[in-house]
């Protein structure tokens, strides 16, 4: 296995594997950072030195989990592996650009880690708001390194998005309409469009911040006629689509997993699912200011953003009830991916309901920047995106490796993880309703109980992460080969065996369309 195979790869399967390994590694780093946060908050009083180092850890935790764990795994890993197989394409449309998309990430990660090590680190929160992120409150190179890190990660994602859009539209057999491609392919397509439209706005915002810090411009400085609120609009115009970018591929995965383990040949309401994803993608761009209800917008502006945000619940509800309808009447196989998928549906819905609460601008004035918000977005990320990743991994592991995971161990792992994340994040709703603010390393004694419970939950999640590594080792050590795969007629990624050959569909796929 020459080193060139991995450094110069133009093969979608190899690049997908690189993304998965990188994402798993970054996930360990992000988990370590989250445990530092929960250790600090496990008791009143100080563990680390001060709020600056605490906020550096919080900021790094967010960036690592979003840009180096969830996105590389869902889009780069499963997207690369599955999209070409699902549409019968020999590879991605631009295989070398695909390689570059991946190799921009390790330098980007390096820059982010470097930012923590110079001066006092970037303790700005992931939104990097000026004036805190300006050159007075954050003198030194920390924030600049963070900005360059984001630039690289952004270029990587934009190139990946171009690649996925071209591949999904252009590389499928001519006889097949877009409405005959699997839902995961659709989810990656919608995600890629969101990336392509939102990331340039982030790039503009952080570039202006860079020049404010180093070239004496005043885009975000009132002293020179600028406005820090402009930065917030630019950031959240990216930031809100970003959260849908994180969850949409998960929606696609859950559709596949639920249909497969219900013994159905397709999910319920295919067209409804597709349109729901497109609606979520569109609406995701016109709700950004709900992150800014406390900055003093007009009451009519707040009314609009409240209503628009609530409308997103409709296509999301279409998806949730379609998953439940897919289960209906099926012969359900209670295998581990199905457990992850059912956990996803329930916990994502809980997270969505707290999101509806927060969409009310009047309520959000009180709940903004409290642990209620932290609980909300960790329910949709730590139990939405992560559960989708786990469902996908356990479901497609035999396809990726040719080996099967130990079914009992993976079920125990699911149970431990389920208890861990819920024990970590459910109490945070109580803290938020008691007005405990985010981004502080210490708190009054009144909040001690639920913080201690939350920190114990984080240790249970750590046990789950270690169990997962053991399960992975066990599968490769035991080498149980795949015997047979069911439902391949409607799950075409499995058609070439486990694992598929290095090159698939070297000749164009022959497709016969049944006319109804």
UniProtKB/Swiss-Prot annotation:
It is found in: Mitochondrion inner membrane. Residues 1-11, 87-94, 171-182, 262-269, 328-335, 401-406, 479-516 are mitochondrial matrix. It catalyses: 4 Fe(II)-[cytochrome c] + O2 + 8 H(+)(in) = 4 Fe(III)-[cytochrome c] + 2 H2O + 4 H(+)(out). Mg(2+) binds at residues 368-369. Heme a3 binds at residue 376. Na(+) binds at residues 40, 45, 441. Its cofactor is heme; Cu cation. Cu cation binds at residues 240, 290-291. PROSITE patterns: COX1 (PS50855), COX1_CUB (PS00077). It comes from the Eukaryota. GO terms for cellular component: mitochondrial inner membrane; respiratory chain complex IV. Fe(II)-heme a binds at residues 61, 378. It is a multi-pass membrane protein. Binds 2 heme A groups non-covalently per subunit. One of its GO terms (biological process) is electron transport coupled proton transport. There is a cross-link at residues 240-244 (1'-histidyl-3'-tyrosine (His-Tyr)). Pathway: Energy metabolism; oxidative phosphorylation. Its main location: mitochondrion. Pfam families: COX1 (PF00115). The chain crosses the membrane at residues 12-40, 51-86, 95-117, 141-170, 183-212, 228-261, 270-286, 299-327, 336-357, 371-400, 407-433, 447-478. Component of the cytochrome c oxidase, the last enzyme in the mitochondrial electron transport chain which drives oxidative phosphorylation. The respiratory chain contains 3 multisubunit complexes succinate dehydrogenase (complex II, CII), ubiquinol-cytochrome c oxidoreductase (cytochrome b-c1 complex, complex III, CIII) and cytochrome c oxidase (complex IV, CIV), that cooperate to transfer electrons derived from NADH and succinate to molecular oxygen, creating an electrochemical gradient over the inner membrane that drives transmembrane transport and the ATP synthase. Component of the cytochrome c oxidase (complex IV, CIV), a multisubunit enzyme composed of 14 subunits. The complex is composed of a catalytic core of 3 subunits MT-CO1, MT-CO2 and MT-CO3, encoded in the mitochondrial DNA, and 11 supernumerary subunits COX4I, COX5A, COX5B, COX6A, COX6B, COX6C, COX7A, COX7B, COX7C, COX8 and NDUFA4, which are encoded in the nuclear genome. Belongs to the heme-copper respiratory oxidase family. This is Cytochrome c oxidase subunit 1. The lineage of its organism: Eukaryota, Metazoa, Chordata, Craniata, Vertebrata. The gene is mt-co1.
């Amino acid at each position: 296995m020459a080193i060139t195979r991995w450094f110069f790869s133009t093969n979608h399967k190899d690049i997908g594997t690189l993304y998965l390994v990188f994402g798993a590694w970054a996930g360990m780093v992000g988990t370590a950072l989250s445990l530092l946060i929960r250790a600090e908050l496990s008791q009143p009083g100080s563990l680390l030195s001060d709020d600056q180092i605490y906020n550096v850890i919080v900021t790094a935790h967010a960036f690592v989990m979003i840009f180096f764990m969830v996105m590389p795994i869902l889009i780069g890993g499963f997207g690369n592996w599955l999209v070409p197989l699902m549409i019968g394409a020999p590879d991605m449309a631009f295989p070398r650009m695909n390689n570059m998309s991946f190799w921009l990430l390790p330098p980007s990660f390096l820059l982010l880690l470097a930012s923590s090590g110079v001066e006092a680190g970037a303790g700005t929160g992931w939104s990097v708001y000026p004036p805190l992120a300006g050159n007075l409150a954050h003198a030194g190179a920390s924030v600049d390194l963070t900005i360059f890190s984001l630039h690289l990660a952004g270029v990587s994602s934009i190139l990946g998005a171009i690649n996925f859009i071209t591949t999904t539209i252009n590389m499928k057999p001519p006889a097949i309409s877009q409405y005959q491609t699997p839902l995961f392919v659709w989810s990656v397509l919608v995600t890629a469009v969101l990336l392509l439209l939102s990331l340039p706005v982030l790039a503009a915002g952080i570039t202006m911040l860079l020049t404010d810090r180093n070239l004496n411009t005043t885009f975000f400085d009132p002293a020179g006629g600028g406005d820090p609120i402009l930065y917030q609009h630019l950031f959240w115009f990216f930031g809100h689509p970003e959260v849908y970018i994180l969850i949409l591929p998960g929606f696609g995965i859950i559709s596949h997993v639920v249909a497969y383990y219900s013994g159905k040949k397709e999910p319920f309401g295919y067209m409804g699912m597709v349109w729901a994803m497109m609606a979520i993608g569109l609406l995701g761009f016109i709700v950004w200011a709900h992150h800014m209800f406390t900055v003093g917008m007009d009451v009519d502006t707040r009314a609009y953003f409240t209503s628009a945000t609530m409308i997103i619940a409709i296509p999301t509800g279409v998806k949730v009830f379609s998953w439940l309808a897919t289960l209906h009447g099926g012969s359900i196989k209670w295998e581990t991916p199905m457990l992850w998928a059912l956990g996803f549906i329930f916990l994502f819905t809980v997270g969505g309901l707290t999101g509806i609460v927060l969409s009310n601008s009047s309520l959000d004035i009180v709940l903004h920047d409290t642990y209620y918000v932290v609980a909300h977005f960790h329910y949709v990320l730590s139990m939405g995106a992560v559960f989708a990743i786990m469902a996908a991994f356990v479901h497609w592991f035999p396809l990726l490796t040719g080996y099967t995971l130990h079914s009992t161990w993976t079920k125990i792992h699911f149970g431990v993880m389920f208890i861990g994340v819920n024990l970590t994040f459910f109490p945070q709703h109580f803290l938020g309703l008691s007005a405990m603010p985010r981004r502080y390393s210490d708190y009054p004694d009144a909040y001690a109980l639920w913080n201690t419970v939350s920190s114990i939950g984080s240790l249970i999640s750590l046990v789950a992460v270690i169990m997962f590594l053991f399960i992975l080792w066990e599968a490769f050590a035991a080498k149980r080969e795949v015997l047979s795969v069911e439902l391949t007629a409607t799950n075409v990624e499995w058609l070439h065996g486990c694992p598929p050959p290095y090159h698939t569909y070297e000749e164009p796929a022959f497709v016969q369309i049944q006319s109804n």
